[in-house]
Amino acid sequence: MAEETNQQAPESGASSSQPTSRPSGPRGGSGGRKFFRRKKVCKFCTEKIDAIPYRDVRLLQQFVAERGKIVPRRLTGVCTTHQRRLTRAIKQARNIALLPFAARY
């Protein structure tokens, strides 16, 4: 019973712990301006590149991280079919030593 009487909120006006001037967002930040993220489009579809050449090291390096890992689709914006072809081309280039398997230390 004693706990119920201690936790009663004041009924007059707004509570002092919450500012009423700005509403907060879902993650605790200010509910301000939302950033617009442009939809990523497949580079190979827009340029109508059908076959991805495994010898084009400059093109393939754009899709390999500096540690040597293949960058995922959600970061590059490449469509599913071209991501598969790109992965195959990167692996071929690695096997004939055009691209490194891992980064230098």
Curated annotation (Swiss-Prot):
Cellular-component GO terms for this entry: cytosolic small ribosomal subunit
UniProt entry tagged with the keyword Lipid metabolism: no
Keyword Ribonucleoprotein found: yes
Gene3D superfamilies: Ribosomal protein S18 (4.10.640.10)
Bias-annotated ranges (Low complexity): 12-25
Biological process (GO), any one: translation
Residues covered by region (Disordered): 1-34
InterPro entries attached to this UniProt entry: Ribosomal_bS18, Ribosomal_bS18_sf
A Gene Ontology molecular function term of the record: structural constituent of ribosome
UniProt entry keywords in alphabetical sequence: Ribonucleoprotein, Ribosomal protein, RNA-binding, rRNA-binding
Bias (Polar residues) ranges: 1-10
Database matches in HAMAP family: Ribosomal_bS18
Subunit structure: Part of the 30S ribosomal subunit. Forms a tight heterodimer with protein bS6.
Family according to the record: Belongs to the bacterial ribosomal protein bS18 family.
Protein role: Binds as a heterodimer with protein bS6 to the central domain of the 16S rRNA, where it helps stabilize the platform of the 30S subunit.
Record protein name field: Small ribosomal subunit protein bS18
Gene this chain is encoded by: rpsR
